A protein has these predicted regions:
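Positively charged n-region of N-terminal signal peptides that target proteins for export
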Residues: 1-5
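Short amphipathic alpha-helical "recognition" segments used for binding
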Residues: 7-8, 75
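Bacterial N-terminal signal peptides
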Residues: 8-16
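Extended terminal accessory/targeting regions
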Residues: 20-199
Length: 199
């Protein structure tokens, strides 16, 4: 092979690797449920908050709907899927666990969107949306947790049938007495949500 080609390939790999390494939240690997409304993480998602050295770990098996954006708003350029999707997974997880306050979770969403290169207008629209309408999801998650429902599927239950929707599978797991696996201590990351500034 020509030396120039090899040098070009090495430079290209370095550039691509550098760009990928700078992504605050790597692209998630997900498996859809039958209706493609809910998705299960096939691999753990890790988000390093700014330069803090602190990481939020969303475990494999967590079920997300990405961004809970009402369908009428999709025609205005906002859908559940976009550059903000990875930040939305972290936000869904924070809303589910509720170890942080709701405001901290919303601020961490905004920080993650800033670091993910989401446009300022979309950051504002999504942040205003979760501040105005997120209480319903927060309360729904609180009630589901109190009722013993899960949103993190244990390793031995990850291979769900492709024809099943999440609400049906969740009920099956509940009826079988399946519990969520233990997750990491959130105390290190919640305080970064006391402001919306990237640390």
């Amino acid at each position: 092979m020509n030396k120039k080609v090899i040098i070009f390939m090495l430079i290209w790999l370095f550039i691509v690797g550098s760009v990928y390494a700078q992504l605050p939240i790597p692209p998630p690997v997900v498996k859809p449920f039958a209706d493609s409304r809910d998705w299960m993480l096939v691999e753990t998602v890790e988000y390093s908050i700014g330069n803090s050295g602190v990481t939020i770990i969303v475990p494999k098996g967590f079920v997300t709907d990405f961004a809970s954006i009402p369908q009428p708003l999709w025609s205005f350029g906002l859908s559940p899927y976009g550059r903000f999707s990875k930040a939305a997974i972290v936000h869904d997880y924070l809303y589910w666990k509720q170890d942080c306050t709701r405001e901290q979770a919303d601020n961490l969403l905004l920080i993650a969107m800033k670091e993910s290169g989401v446009s300022r207008s979309q950051q504002s629209e999504i942040y205003v949306g979760v501040r105005a309408g997120g209480e319903t999801a927060w309360e729904s998650n609180r009630k589901d947790r109190a009722a013993g429902l899960i949103k993190i599927i244990p390793d031995d239950r990850l291979n769900f049938p492709y024809e099943i929707n999440w609400p049906d599978y969740r009920k099956q797991l509940f009826d079988l007495g399946v519990k969520e696996p233990q997750t990491t201590d959130p105390s290190a990351y919640c305080s970064f949500g006391n402001s919306a500034d990237v640390p």
